Amino acid sequence: SLMATYSSGGGTQKYLPFAPRGVWTFSPLGYMIGGLPTRYSFDLFLAPGRVLRIERIDWRPVPVAPAERTEHERIVTYMMRRVDPAWRWTGPGIPDVKPPYTNLFVGESRRIWVLLHQEAQQNAPDLEDTDEAGADPQLTWTEPVAFDVFEPDGRYLGMVRAPKGFSTRPSPVIRGDTVWAVVHGALDVPFVNRFVIRRD
C-alpha cells in the first residue's frame, strides 16, 4: 500500500492498483470461501480440517496497458498530494499484470461467481467534469464485467459476461441463471435490473 501523511499528523493510505488482495465471502451452506489472487485459486473452508481448493491452471495473466498504468499513477499521485503536497511515489510500482480475480460472490444456488480482471477499455471522459475547476481526475480506463462460475464441488461451468453499465456494488443477487444488479444508465442514474443468462 501507499501512504501520505498530513503535516499536522495522521494521513491516508491507498492500495497499490492491481496488487493482489485477499478476498473472502460466505456460502449459504455455512462455510467461508476465500483466496489471495497471486494465482487463480481459492479455498472452500468446508469444516475444520476440510478444505477444497479450486484452481484454474490454464489462466493467462491480463496485462496492464501502459496508458492504463499512467492514468492510475496520475490519479493516485493527485489524491496523495491533496494530503501531502510534497508526496512522491517511492513505494512499489504498479504490477505489469493484473491478478486473476478481484472478488468472489456466492449465489442462492450455492454457485461461486469469480469476478475476473479483464483487459481495460478507455472511455471518453465526461467533458463537464473535466472542465470544472479543481475537479478530481477521472478514471477513463475501465474493465468490462465478467465472471467465471463454479459449482460448489469445484466443477467449472463457464464464463458469464455482463452488459455495459453492470455494477458489482452493491453485490448482485444471484438465483440460478437469474441475476439482479444495479445498472448505471446513460446519465449515470442507478437502477436495479434483472438479467437472465443466455447460454451459447
Language-model-derived ranges and their functions:
Residues S1-D200:
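Eukaryotic scaffold repeat domains enriched in small/polar residues
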